[in-house]
Amino acid sequence: MLEHFPWLTTMIALPLVAALFIPLIPDKDGKQVRWYALGVGLADFVLMSYVFWTNYDISSTGFQLQEKFSWIPQFGLSWSVSVDGISMPLVLLAGLVTTLSIFAAWQVDHKPRLFYFLMLVLYAAQIGVFVAQDMLLLFIMWELELVPVYLLVCIWGGQKRQYAAMKFLLYTAAASVFILVAALGLAFYGDVTTFDIAELGLKDYPIALELFLYAGLLIAFGVKLAIFPFHTWLPDAHGEASAPVSMILAGVLLKMGGYGLIRLNLGLLEDAHVYFAPILVILGVVNIIYGGFSSFAQDNMKRRLAYSSVSHMGFVLLGIASFTDLGISGAMLQMLSHGLIAAVLFFLAGVTYDRTHTLSLAQMGNIGKVMPTVFALFTMGAMASLALPGMSGFVSELAVFVGVSSSDIYSTPFKTVTVFLAAVGLVLTPIYLLSMLRQLFYGNNIPPSCNLEQDNLSANSDQEAVCFGTSCVLPGNAIYDDARPREVFIAACFLLPIIAVGLYPKLATQTYDATTVAVNSQVRQSYVQIAETNPRVYAEALTAPHIPTTDFATVKVQP
């Protein structure tokens, strides 16, 4: 009986339906609402963990837990959801990060009902993006996610919250048009009209159409992944968003871009990917170096972490474009690893802001003695971000480096330059992170004081602005308190899997390796066919790739 139960639909419906009951909860100060929202988030995370543990086969490369029925037949729209090795780990990541972000927002008292309503709607939309197997359904879920994020930044942000929220909305909404165009182009090509992603993968598209749609999807997913030059919304959004919202922005929303590239660009447009892969490599290197230098130049703590995310997403691009099993596996692990690391760093940035009421690194310093636990947790998160051995970040970035270096598609000079430049960017990471720790917790600066009376006056001048890390204005005797048990628990929930995956990467890689190997095999077969058809033209490309003898075919190059 349970074999045919709509588990994935339930995962989406639970937070969405539960959000509708929030207005009915009799609650003035938000205490009951926050417990209700946390209970719903935790229940959904426990549900997905149970379902994947008991009903998901990690050795399978196909879609599992499939549910499909006609929804709006006039538009060819079906409710089609399923998971595979690419989506299942990201669903778990979304569940963990969003549940803990709800717990991190424990002291929100400004419009708490609306806040937790939007958080639960966002929870459902994130899961919907990762499990959708219908292109129109994917587009709907993609758009649904924009609204709560816009409102969460616009209402519970800093003084420039409206500018940051509008910039996020314009960037992502404009980019999502390319997803709709791609959906229509893929669906209506050929004799059969369908939006089902699995069926779209069976069509044989002309290379011109693939290149056009690939470019559009690269823009759409590049905005979400914060690829240069489409990244500028991210530092502004992080700089103005509250800590719980920043946790979701960095921990989950960025990963939607990487997921889309693997699912659609590699999965459906593999011929076009052969031509675009060198461009992805170049963009990845630019992201790594540009993000590193830009991060070092930031005085705002959250903007520094935002540019750090830009840099780390460059490794995802390198892995996706590597044409190797290890490289794509490293890209997946980088998304999962960064989702945990970025979430804990932004959470701890919010914890620090609660005490100091400033994000300016120049105004901080010498608070390590009064907040030793926060200092220790922040240091562990920073070490994970700079890829310290024993942490998940080290494994993912090493896999990408080895994957690119061992690729038999690119020429040796191209690989050498790529690895060297990426290594330069990697060296920048400890520079800007360790300098941030020094400015935060060391130095001779007097710890920043918080004038509660002045804070109240500032709040009155902008009544809709809510400046908080994980809370609003704290009592005077709590400004320099060390981490509370709730905050230690949240940080530990992120740091423990970071360390566990760093020590035993198979905990994560075994969930998706079968699928990423299948995706890479498909892409490599496309490369062989293209090179076999026109080896001279392709060999004259910028990267000067040579045509290897692969496991799939022996390529004969005509003189």
From Swiss-Prot:
GO terms classed as biological process = aerobic respiration; ATP synthesis coupled electron transport; electron transport coupled proton transport
> Per UniProt, which keywords does this protein have?
Membrane, NAD, NADP, Plastoquinone, Quinone, Thylakoid, Translocase, Transmembrane, Transmembrane helix
What is this protein's function?
NDH-1 shuttles electrons from NAD(P)H, via FMN and iron-sulfur (Fe-S) centers, to quinones in the respiratory chain. The immediate electron acceptor for the enzyme in this species is believed to be plastoquinone. Couples the redox reaction to proton translocation (for every two electrons transferred, four hydrogen ions are translocated across the cytoplasmic membrane), and thus conserves the redox energy in a proton gradient.
Which organism does this sequence originate in? Synechocystis sp. (strain ATCC 27184 / PCC 6803 / Kazusa)
Name of the protein in question: NAD(P)H-quinone oxidoreductase chain 4-2
Q: Name one GO molecular function term.
A: ubiquinone binding
Q: Does the keyword Magnesium apply?
A: no
Q: What is its EC number?
A: 7.1.1.-
Record field: transmembrane: 5-25, 35-55, 86-106, 114-134, 136-156, 168-188, 207-227, 242-262, 274-294, 310-330, 331-351, 374-394, 417-437, 488-508
Taxonomic superkingdom: Bacteria
In this record, what's one Pfam family?
Proton_antipo_M
Catalytic activity from the UniProt record = a plastoquinone + NADH + (n+1) H(+)(in) = a plastoquinol + NAD(+) + n H(+)(out); a plastoquinone + NADPH + (n+1) H(+)(in) = a plastoquinol + NADP(+) + n H(+)(out)
Q: Where in the cell is it found?
A: Cellular thylakoid membrane
Q: Which HAMAP family match?
A: NDH1_NuoM
Q: Which GO terms describe its cellular component?
A: plasma membrane-derived thylakoid membrane
Class of enzymatic activity (EC top level)? translocase
Q: How does it sit in the membrane?
A: Multi-pass membrane protein
